[in-house]
């Protein structure tokens, strides 16, 4: 699987993502800087976590207006898979690639801990390595992960199976509506999620529950 990791000022999880993708796919991702307007032929584009542009204005608002985002939008329109984790999720929402909004955590505090996720839809290119309803462990680290959507949007994404992950009962760290932790677009090739699967891919790091997401994408390419 060929992949690319986007780099923007303030993102600080790019090295973790590069390490995870390299270990799982056997190929080191190319890195794409914010000013680039072309992205090479890849199977997966990842926008990692962090605090792009210091989270000024709104989380992801400035990053979503960088030149590289139009290239990502164009690739997504052609069916290339795009994954946004944490700040990457916020950027995808700000860019209009995913529905809804991400607000300040209900606690008004930065949350950094391990939580449990429930796989709501295991029939996608991002989740097929998991079982339907499987509960996995995954770390979170964010201040603005409270997912919100209006009633019409919420009904649509729930009805379409666009919600892939929910925080398991009693573990919602931010107040997200319907315990939503990860959402994909209607086409099924763009996923945004607040938890960090790249930080739980091998036993030496405490477990490998996050590996399934990347393995799913890899299996689609290999099929």
Swiss-Prot record:
UniProt subcellular location: Cytoplasm
GO biological process, any: 'de novo' IMP biosynthetic process
Lineage: superkingdom: Bacteria
Pathway membership: Purine metabolism; IMP biosynthesis via de novo pathway; 5-amino-1-(5-phospho-D-ribosyl)imidazole from N(2)-formyl-N(1)-(5-phospho-D-ribosyl)glycinamide: step 1/2
Main location: cytoplasm
Keyword Ligase recorded: yes
All copies of domain Glutamine amidotransferase type-1, residue ranges: 3-223
Keyword vocabulary terms for this entry: ATP-binding, Cytoplasm, Glutamine amidotransferase, Hydrolase, Ligase, Nucleotide-binding, Purine biosynthesis
GO MF term set: ATP binding; glutaminase activity; phosphoribosylformylglycinamidine synthase activity
EC numbers for this chain: 6.3.5.3, 3.5.1.2
Residue numbers annotated as active site: 86, 196, 198
SMART domains: GATase_5
Keyword Nucleotide-binding: yes
Reactions accelerated catalytically: N(2)-formyl-N(1)-(5-phospho-beta-D-ribosyl)glycinamide + L-glutamine + ATP + H2O = 2-formamido-N(1)-(5-O-phospho-beta-D-ribosyl)acetamidine + L-glutamate + ADP + phosphate + H(+); L-glutamine + H2O = L-glutamate + NH4(+)
GO CC terms in record: cytoplasm
Function: Part of the phosphoribosylformylglycinamidine synthase complex involved in the purines biosynthetic pathway. Catalyzes the ATP-dependent conversion of formylglycinamide ribonucleotide (FGAR) and glutamine to yield formylglycinamidine ribonucleotide (FGAM) and glutamate. The FGAM synthase complex is composed of three subunits. PurQ produces an ammonia molecule by converting glutamine to glutamate. PurL transfers the ammonia molecule to FGAR to form FGAM in an ATP-dependent manner.
Assembly mode: Part of the FGAM synthase complex composed of 1 PurL, 1 PurQ and 2 PurS subunits.
Protein name stated in the entry: Phosphoribosylformylglycinamidine synthase subunit PurQ
UniProt lineage: Bacteria, Pseudomonadati, Pseudomonadota, Alphaproteobacteria, Hyphomicrobiales
């Amino acid at each position: 699987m060929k992949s690319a990791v986007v780099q923007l000022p303030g993102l600080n999880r790019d090295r973790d993502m590069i390490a995870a993708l390299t270990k799982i796919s056997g190929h080191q991702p190319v890195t794409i800087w914010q000013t680039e307007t072309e992205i090479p032929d890849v199977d997966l584009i990842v926008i990692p976590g962090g605090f792009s542009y210091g989270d000024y204005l709104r989380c992801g608002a400035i990053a979503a207006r960088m030149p590289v985002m139009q290239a990502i939008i164009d690739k997504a329109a052609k069916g290339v898979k795009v994954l946004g984790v944490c700040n990457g999720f916020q950027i995808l929402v700000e860019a209009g690639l995913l529905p809804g909004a991400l607000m300040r955590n209900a606690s008004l505090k930065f949350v950094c801990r391990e939580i449990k996720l429930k796989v709501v839809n295991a029939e996608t290119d991002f989740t097929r390595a998991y079982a339907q309803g499987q509960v996995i462990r995954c770390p979170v680290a964010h201040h603005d992960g409270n997912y919100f959507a209006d009633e019409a949007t919420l009904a649509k994404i729930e009805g379409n199976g666009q919600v892939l992950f929910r925080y398991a009962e009693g573990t919602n760290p931010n107040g997200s509506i319907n315990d939503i932790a990860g959402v994909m677009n209607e086409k099924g090739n763009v996923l945004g999620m607040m938890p960090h699967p790249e930080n739980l891919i091998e036993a030496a790091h405490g477990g490998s529950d996050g590996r399934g997401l990347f393995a799913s994408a890899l299996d689609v390419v290999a099929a």
